[in-house]
Amino acid sequence: MSQIAQPITIRNTTFKNRIIKGAMSEALANYEGQPNDLHLGLYSAWAKGGLGCAITGNVMVNFEAKNEPGVVVIETERDLERLKEWAAVGKQYGMVQLIQLSHPGRQCPKGLNKETVAPSAVPFSPALATMFGTPRALTHEEILDIIKRFANAARICEKAGFEGVQLHGAHGYLISQFLSPLTNKRTDQWGGSIENRTRFLLEVYKAVREATSESFIISVKLNSADFQRGGISEEDVISVFKAVDEAGIDLIEISGGTYEAPAMAGAKADKRKASTIAREAYFLDFAEKIRQHVKCKLMVTGGFRTVEGMNAALASGACDFIGIARPLAVETDLTDRLIAGQDVRYAVKPIKTGLPFVDKMAIMEIIWYAAQFKAIGQGKKPNPKLSPLIVFLNYAKGNIKAVVQGRVNSRKSA
């Protein structure tokens, strides 16, 4: 049996194979952050395609802190019945589902929320300052409230029938902002030393663990590096991985980058050593290193394109799961094909509109794939040749209309 086809168990949940869909922003929810039939259609397509596990796109824990329009928000049990339908889609086809819980912190476009908050009031680089405003530093009480929100959202996810959650601690979102010395300038218990900067993540994990059952899976997505000068050091990264592993985390997904240095979207020049390129995965070298320090399951996402490369990564022991994201946006049956020995069919090329100020941002990658997700959710086939420029213009038109009408910030409990 191929390595990728072998089942594996975490707590009481068996994953039928080693392929996990990495989180990608769906942007399919309505203005009130509610999931709908498009989510059911999209995840049903992946489940029917043999996927072992799907990690959802960002699900926000606070309606007033959304990273983009169309994001799902879980604050209350308002949408419990719809969430149950979503969870049932996976169970019908034996696909595990982990809801990715997140808070964007400062990483929110201007005009989307009334204000942005972060560990510290650190502005974005000049290149992105026109799109993202300077945040307000969180108070101690607000930090505790956000921790409770993560726990409450996880509780609701379990009640709905999902097998677990993933805490988004990468890509420059709030947990990542606490971890990085570039965005965390605090001098209290939440900042300073790496132990203090890790405190928020650990407190979120502990709160989620206490709010859910022993069989509920808790994963976290962490950066191997943020690829910014003065950012978190490798020594500190290893410390974070060890701390969350010792706390009892079940699965760590290894990623990297932020909106200011978007390695997660494949936007950086490829400076990996030749041996890593030959083995495909962006973060496999780091996985091999961190494997010596942690006992939990590891997942590497980014760059896998051949069955041989995936099987080799699993056989090496560097990781337990293969994360695949963008190829699944244009090949919903990819998992079945991989297990049958066929490689990724479509080469995933950088998404370029021809507009320099747009193309330098990771957001273009996100919205192009979101357009594919909408088509899949409607029962249509994805289109690998879809024009990025047309997608961007439609996205910009829709967002400007939403902000002008004031519907994005309409306050209804989620």
In which residue ranges do the predicted regions lie?
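Flavin-dependent oxidoreductase catalytic cores
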Residues: 1-414
